[in-house]
Amino acid sequence: GTLFVNGQIRRNASVLNGALTYKQADNSTVIINGSNAIPTRAKLEITNFGSIFNMSGTSTLRLIRGGGTSFGDLFLQAASNTVTGGTILCQQGGIGTPQTYSIDALVPIFNLTVDGSTALNTATARVINNPLTIKGALLINDDFSIFSGNGINVNILGNLVNNNSSNATGINAGGYQSGSVTQLTT
């Protein structure tokens, strides 16, 4: 089935404590639109003692809007996690403005896909604060899709598929951008 969330899945906006349990399995889809979001809270925020993040199967978590500030857009610092499958998809729905999706994850994710579609619908996934571990594949889908390591280490246990045909070179050019000369991608 599909769950459409117009806003965010997060803690109460007035406190930093609180815990959520997020479990997604099989071929389910969760779409977080991020409409009228509080920018100081992530679109999906799983953190604190007692929080759980589980993702498996061929499930898909799609983030439509970026723009989160304090905690980014995907803030995964769950106390407990089991990640054996699933894809996190940074793909807007034809909003008409480029979107940057900030990812701060202390827990691993399985697959990450960055999927823009036109110059007006460019999608950039950007790592913030903590090293990112991707247990499966990182897919940079097309010329309007960018992944930025932002100078933070990225560990990809599966494949890196970069379909961005840009011939630009450098730490801040092309489809995969390390962000610094000391950033480590393994």
Where are these regions (language model features)?
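Extracellular beta-sheet-rich ligand-binding/adhesion modules
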Residues: 1-186
